[in-house]
Amino acid sequence: SLCAQTRALPVLIVAGLPVVSGAKLYNCAAVVYQGRVLGIVPKTHLPNYGEFYERRWFVPAPDGSCGFVRGYGEGEVPFGRMLFQCEELGEFCFAVELCEDLWAPVAPSAAYAAAGATVIANLSASVETVGKDDYRRALVTGQSGRLVCGYLYANAGEGESTTDLVFSGHSMIAENGSMLAQTGRFEQTMAVSEIDVQRLAFERRRLTTFPDRDVQAFLTVPFSMPPAETKLTRPVPALVFVPPEGSGRDRCCAGILQVQAHGLKKRIDHTGAKTAVVGISGGLDSALALLVCVRAMELLGRPRTDVHAVTMPC
């Protein structure tokens, strides 16, 4: 079994499975760590349109607090919507949602993030249609940005049981609105990256609109995962404020110049200044300042001679 095979591995695994609780059948994700099932999370939003008919078999996740189920390890296992908290790293708190949960108007991940989850894992079986990969990509990156979280999206691929549907295995790792890694469609590969949960926690403290952790209470399941040194696969740019060559740098720089020039244009127009005086030292900063002054005058429809450049001693 999965638990027996992973007992010695310090790896968190999220696996999909059907679970019977009471008289109902649920579409669920089990969180497994070192051979033990930490908890089972049922799917909240069940699609029943187009090619989907999940309500034929399953019922949505029950409202209210977590319950418990038996038969998935020793004793009772938590069942419901919950958080999983790393004891050694307070900023690493994760939660799970399933497929359609992300596509719903109010995703469970929003409540999880408000309650403290910095990483969301999503088990998905998103069918492949023309252009859908772009929409999925926008959903995942957008949700990670809105929630200031890391988002792991694992999609069904080749080998998935199917009739008239096709699954491409398009999987992604996003962080705070940026795509860190993704697999190509119909490729037998994995998406691997690192998520900076401490940076995410800092961003949430900085944003005054991000809610406090006690907005909605969830059962929190602790687990012990001591930090270990690993090889960094995530690229760290030397120029953190400028995109790398060939990935929108020209557009970014043009946008910077446009913002600064329009800001200066407003001040010149508001104060009624007849000229703009800029000191030129020979460095990059003063060169940019001169370009901004020239562009501002162009926006005002005034000649460049209204910019007075004064050379300064080195």
Give names to the regions the model predicted:
Residues S1-G279, L290-R304:
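Enzyme catalytic cores with a strong preference for nitrogen-chemistry domains
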Residues A287:
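PAZ/PAZ-like end-binding module
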Residues V307-M312:
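Short beta-alpha connecting loops at secondary-structure transitions
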Residues G283:
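Conserved G/P- and acidic residue-centered "switch" motifs that form tight phosphate/ATP-binding loops
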